[in-house]
Amino acid sequence: MNVDEFIMKIKRRETPFYDRLYRIAFAARHFEVPLVRGLHDAGYHERRFRIATWRSFWRAAYYQPIFRSRCARCGKNLHLMNSGQGIPVIEGDLRIVIGDNVTLYDRITLAGLTVGENPTLTIGDNTMIGMPIAIMVGGEVSIGSNCLIGSNLIADNPGHNLDYKRRFQKLVKIVIGKVKIGNYVFAGHQSMIVGNVTIGDGAIVGVNTVVTEDVPPFCIVSGNPARLLKKLPFPKEMIEIVGEKEYQKYLDAKIET
C-alpha cells in the first residue's frame, strides 16, 4: 500500500483504526490557542504597527526615490500608498509630471504607448489616484488638481488599431486623442474614461461609468455609456476661474431621463 492509498483509507474512515486516525488529524488541523482577549488584541495592533512601520521605511528610503527618478518633474510631498507592490508599474517611454501633495497607490499601471509621440501624463496638486487604475497614454492625459480618481482605466486611445488585419501588427498607428480631467473631479471606482474626452471642473463620474464623450463641469454622470443625471450647484467664484465658455457648457447641459 502506497502513501496515497493510505491517505484515502483515512479520508474514507474504512475501519475503526482509520477512523481514529481521521479524528486525530481533524483535531490537529483545527487546533488553535484559546483566545486571550487583551493579549491577542495587543498582538493585532502590534502587527499592524510593525507592517506600517516597515512599509513606511521602505517607501521613504527606496520606493519613492526610485519612482521620482522616472518622473520628468515630481513636486514635494509625494506619497506612495504601499499595499505590497512598492511602486506603480511604469511601461514604455512615458513622460510623467506630478504636482505637489499627490498621493498614488502602488498597485497601478502608468503606460506610454510606443506608437505615440512623446506620451505625457500630468497630475495636478493635491490629487489622489487610487487602485487598480491603468492609465494608457498615447498622446496626453492630464488630471487636474484636488481630484479623487478611483477609475479602472483612463486611456486617450483604443489600445489597438481598429482594422482587424493590422490589429496585431507592431508599431501600427492608432487613433490618439487627449484626455483632460479638470480640477475637483471625483471619478468613482471602476469607472472608465476613454478617447478624446474632457471632463469639466467639479464633475462626478459614478461607479462603473464608461465615459466616451465630454462631461460638463459640475455635473454628475453615470451608466454605460455615461449619461447626465444631475447638475450640481455652480459656485459663483468658479465662473471666473473656469471661464465663461465652460460655464456656458454647464448651462447648456441637459439632464437625460
Task: State the predicted function of each range.
Residues 174-180, 193:
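Solenoidal tandem-repeat scaffolds enriched in leucines and small polar residues
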Residues 153, 160, 198, 209-210, ...:
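Flexible glycine-rich beta->alpha loop in the catalytic core of nucleotide-sugar glycosyltransferases
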Residues 1-157, 182-184, 217, 226-230, ...:
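Domain-scale signature associated with acetyltransferase and cell-envelope carbohydrate enzymes
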Residues 210-212, 220, 228:
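Conserved hydrophobic/aromatic beta-strand scaffold that supports enzyme active sites
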